[in-house]
From Swiss-Prot:
Entry protein name: Thiol:disulfide interchange protein DsbG
Entry's Gene Ontology cellular component terms: periplasmic space
Family: Belongs to the thioredoxin family. DsbC subfamily.
Subcellular localization: Periplasm
Functional summary from the UniProt entry: Involved in disulfide bond formation. Functions probably as a disulfide isomerase with a narrower substrate specificity than DsbC. DsbG is maintained in a reduced state by DsbD. In vitro, displays chaperone activity in both redox states.
InterPro entries xref list: DiS-bond_Isoase_DsbC/G, DiS-bond_isomerase_DsbC/G_N, DiS-bond_isomerase_DsbC/G_N_sf, Thiol:disulfide_interchange, Thioredoxin-like_fold, Thioredoxin-like_sf
Residues in the signal sequence: 1-17
Keywords tagged on the record: Chaperone, Disulfide bond, Periplasm, Redox-active center, Signal
Subunit note: Homodimer.
Intrachain disulfide bonds: 126-129
Superkingdom to which the source organism belongs: Bacteria
CDD domains, per database record: DsbA_DsbC_DsbG
A matching Pfam family: Thioredoxin_2
Length: 248
């Protein structure tokens, strides 16, 4: 599951215009930012907000004199609050992060019209990145999945220069594939100093990776069938791998 803290940070800091009832205002003073209202069961009025790294729901009783902060469940045991938070907060923010990845500097591995898209943040010296690259071969080679790799230089001091060498090659995507296929043994023309252009790409990728809440590679992102952004950090197990590759 994608870390929520970064998604909440994407929400616009817009002051809630409607005058809040006194009980809700008292809860708001505890550091909660009210985002919108919604109709809640039982004649109550709901308020959707955020607090630190969490989405929160507040329920105002029909008499307007009491407010409850927390989850609401129905008779089937379904968490109505969490469903609302996912739909109204996390899902839209996740789609925005997906768009940021689409607009970033990535290397294509596979057919550009492959139906399943998977983004991967990878370091040239990351052994698990190489294993994931190998794991993905059946899906990529069959045209079912396209991997979009965002190179970063975070593991070793020589990582940035090695990543820059790949980016500066005649065909970066092909060079990256050959590098991973060789287990990192492909000879590269590693520069003594990373150019400003390549450093910007790496810095932008690392910033995006950080904004997504990941601090290790591979950091893998894909969309679920519900069109919500999902995250898998590290080498995925077989069950997770199947989900990532669209075998739901």
């Amino acid at each position: 599951m994608l870390k929520k803290i970064l998604l909440l940070a994407l929400l616009p800091a817009i002051a809630f215009a409607e005058e809040l009832p006194a009980p809700v205002k008292a809860i708001e003073k505890q550091g909660i930012t009210i985002i919108k209202t919604f109709d809640a069961p039982g004649g109550m009025k709901g308020y959707l907000g955020k607090y630190q790294d969490m989405g929160v729901t507040i329920y105002l009783t029909p008499d307007g004199k009491h407010a409850i902060s927390g989850y609401m469940y129905n008779e089937k045991g379904e968490n109505l609050s969490n469903t609302l938070i996912e739909k109204e907060i996390y899902a839209p923010a996740g789609r925005e992060m997906w768009q940021r990845m689409e607009q970033s500097h990535w290397l294509l591995d596979g057919k550009k019209d492959a139906p399943v898209i998977v983004y991967v943040f990878a370091d040239p010296f990351c052994p698990y990145c190489k294993q994931f690259w190998q794991q993905a071969r059946p899906w990529v080679d069959s045209g079912k999945v396209q991997l979009r790799t965002l190179l970063v230089g975070v593991i070793k001091p020589e990582s940035p220069a090695t990543a820059a060498a790949i980016l500066a090659s005649k065909d970066p995507a092909k060079t990256w594939q050959e590098y991973e296929a060789s287990g990192g043994k492909l000879k590269l023309n590693v520069p003594a100093n990373v150019s400003t252009e390549q450093m910007k790409v790496l810095s932008d990728n690392e910033k995006l990776m950080d904004d997504l809440g990941a601090n290790v590679t591979p950091a893998i992102y894909y969309m679920s069938k519900e069109n919500t952004l999902q995250q898998a950090v590290g080498l995925p197990d077989q069950k997770t791998l199947n989900i990532i590759m669209g075998n739901k």
